[in-house]
Curated annotation (Swiss-Prot):
This is Methionine--tRNA ligase. It comes from Mycoplasmopsis pulmonis (strain UAB CTIP). Pfam families: tRNA-synt_1g (PF09334). A motif ('HIGH' region) lies at residues 12-22. Is required not only for elongation of protein synthesis but also for the initiation of all mRNA translation through initiator tRNA(fMet) aminoacylation. Belongs to the class-I aminoacyl-tRNA synthetase family. MetG type 2B subfamily. Its EC number is 6.1.1.10. A motif ('KMSKS' region) lies at residues 302-306.
Length: 509
């Protein structure tokens, strides 16, 4: 039986258009899904739209739209965006779905019956923009006003009746959870302990009475379930949890091998403290990994409209193509820290990696084959040191790639792919096949190894550039690149190489 993996992105807030940070998160999850697929896993990948909250209601009012019409429109825009980005998924979550709302309501009442959720009064600070309650100790104070510590949005003081989730019932358990190797970043774990656990965990307000758009706890109640108890449970309702047909939930969560959430560092508190506690309260299995990544910044710092440095991903896709953008975001940015983006860096990475290294290797190899042979090139054993070394590099390449990918270090994984290309180009320089003739067996030995090296690189690149890799596979005489053929150096023995159209053209800024 195949192993399974369930991979999720956060569901994005539809009060505005998707930006570069959204495609960054989703691309990490999508690449991980593609990688796991070629490793033989059965995968389920979800993204979506977080459609409740006061901010959504206000935005719809501002546009003179019914709130449901507004979120329908935004969800369609999100779906169109992922099509443009050529990012496919198995499920698009919408928290306004009837099934999701029913299950969340049931969960609320189940936890209320268990006295994990209780009624009290909330007095404190609230950010409408971030849909988040904060204490005065968590907020930034300036000129007698309070501001959100991450977004800098001004906080309002509110006092209202609210239902609370008793987080403190789970304080000892969550400390143990944070010490497990589930959260990808140790720095984030230390930050969560320092800022929240060690200061004492405040019980969480999970309903509001002055909220115009959300899930009512029942038809007659003034209480509306507040964002995180609603939004986080879509990770389960996507799979049919709590519904009549729970087969996907059974397969990918309850009995699944891997359950992976990809999240930006700004929402780790909700995913690494609240979400595990919510699951524990229902005796549901934990995620096996929560991948927390940094932000995308520009050379001038964080993107903001006031700085005029906000990058529109749609413009980038139209200008460079979705695969070039996705390659840069996964191959040149580390999930462990904030990543710097600029068009200059994108173009430089593309030209250096894909044009100078990979495309140049293909064109040098194919040109020498076409100049010398009108037949397939067979794999011939060689005892020459340079041939044995390059064979070893090619055979070890995917193993090296996997050693990084298993740690979610895709930047290092793809760096190892490009390094193989550099070694193959150096192999050409060392063996100088242009001085050999077709009567010389050494020429066939070299060119066959170069073809096998190109195959290995293209196979790895197919994880982030499937369309371009597919074109190259066809040009080389294969239906697709396959893991099972990586170490079979005789795969080109019956393939006559034809002229290959250039797949990577140099970009000038």
């Amino acid at each position: 039986m195949k192993k399974t993996i369930y991979i999720t992105t956060p569901i994005y807030y539809p009060s505005g258009d998707l930006h570069l940070g959204h495609i960054y998160s989703t691309n990490i999850a999508w690449v991980l899904r593609n990688y796991k697929k070629i490793q033989g896993y059965e995968t389920f990948f979800s993204t979506g739209s977080d459609e409740h909250g006061q901010k959504i209601f206000n935005k719809a009012q501002e546009l003179k739209l019914e709130t449901q019409d507004y979120v329908d429109r935004q969800a369609n825009k999100f779906i169109d965006f992922w099509k443009k980005a050529n990012i496919d998924y198995d499920f698009f979550a919408r928290t306004t779905n009837k099934e999701h709302k029913e299950v969340v309501r049931e969960i609320f009442h189940k936890l209320k019956e268990k006295n994990i959720i209780y009624l009290d009064k909330y007095v404190g600070l609230y950010s409408v923009s971030d849909e988040e309650f904060l204490t005065e100790t968590q907020a930034l104070k300036k000129d007698n006003k309070f501001f959100h510590p991450v977004s800098n949005h001004e906080l309002i003081k509110i006092e209202e009746e609210s239902y609370f989730f008793n987080l403190n019932l789970f304080i000892d358990w969550i400390k143990e959870f944070l010490d497990q190797d589930i959260i990808s970043s140790k720095a984030i774990v230390n930050e969560l302990k320092s800022n929240f656990i060690n200061k004492g965990l405040e019980n969480l307000s999970v309903t509001r009475i002055k909220l115009d758009w959300g899930i009512k706890i029942d038809q007659s109640s003034k209480h509306v379930i507040y964002v995180w108890l609603d939004a986080l449970f879509q990770y389960l309702t996507n799979l049919g949890y709590g519904s009549k047909n729970q087969s996907l939930y059974e397969k990918f969560w309850k009995n699944g091998d891997e359950r992976v959430h990809v999240v930006g560092k700004e929402i780790t508190r909700f995913h690494c403290i609240y979400w595990p506690i919510f699951l524990k309260s229902l005796n549901v299995k934990m995620p096996t990994k929560i991948i927390s990544h940094g932000w995308i910044v520009t050379p001038e710092g964080k993107m903001s409209k006031s700085k005029g440095n906000v990058v529109d991903p749609v413009v980038l896709i139209e200008k460079y193509g979705s695969e070039v953008l996705k390659y840069f975001l996964i191959a040149k940015l580390s999930i462990k820290k904030d990543g710097v983006f600029s068009e200059e860096l994108l173009v430089s990475a593309y030209n250096n990696d894909l044009v100078n290294t990979f495309s140049n290797l293909i064109s040098r190899t194919v040109k020498m084959i076409l100049n010398n042979y009108d037949r397939p090139l067979s794999f011939i054993l060689s005892k020459d040191q340079e041939d044995l070394e390059i064979e070893k590099d090619i055979k070890n390449s995917f193993e090296t790639f996997c050693s990084f990918a298993e740690e979610y270090e895709f930047d290092k994984a793809f760096e190892s792919t490009i390094n193989l290309g550099k070694k193959l180009n150096l192999y050409i320089d060392k063996t100088r096949p242009w001085l050999l003739t077709k009567e010389d067996q050494k020429l066939e030995i070299v060119l066959n190894r170069l073809l096998n090296g190109i195959y290995a690189m293209a196979f790895e690149l197919s994880i982030v550039m499937p369309q371009t890799s597919q074109k190259l596979a066809k040009a080389l005489g294969f239906e697709s690149f396959e893991k099972s053929k990586l170490e079979d150096f005789k795969k080109f023995d019956n393939i006559k190489i034809e002229k290959i159209e250039n797949l990577f053209n140099r970009i000038k800024l």
